[in-house]
């Protein structure tokens, strides 16, 4: 894996959808694709495309569990990048937490949702 550069990080975070993904994962730890689709009100192909970009840059890690793919922030990102993500999260913390609370009651691993797309 290539080393994450500042230019790569800022290019990734300059998109509203990718920034939203990163901030939600910072708040919640790990989410599946369907949770991110619901939280950001975006289609699965669009979210998957953005997740692939974040994964390829080394910002995210994924793991498969049955038919679901779960994503989380990589613990291997440089400390300077983690600090930037943390500052972005702090500036949007209230908004992110509102979305996180809604997701907590309906995420795909919870019992209130029968099918995850």
Curated annotation (Swiss-Prot):
GO terms for molecular function: DNA binding; DNA-binding transcription factor activity. PROSITE patterns: HTH_ARSR_1 (PS00846), HTH_ARSR_2 (PS50987). InterPro entries: ArsR-like_HTH, ArsR_HTH, HTH_ArsR_DNA-bd_dom, HTH_MetalResp_TranReg, WH-like_DNA-bd_sf, WH_DNA-bd_sf. GO terms for biological process: response to arsenic-containing substance. Residues 33-52 bind DNA. Pfam families: HTH_5. It comes from the Bacteria. The keyword Repressor applies. Keywords: Arsenical resistance, DNA-binding, Plasmid, Repressor, Transcription, Transcription regulation. Residues 1-92 form the HTH arsR-type domain. The keyword Repressor applies. Disulfide bonds: none annotated. Transcriptional repressor for the ars operon. ArsR is a trans-acting regulatory protein which controls its own expression. The repressive effect of ArsR is alleviated by oxyions of +III oxidation state of arsenic, antimony, and bismuth, as well as arsenate (As(V)). Binds DNA as a homodimer. This is Arsenical resistance operon repressor. It comes from Escherichia coli. The gene is arsR.
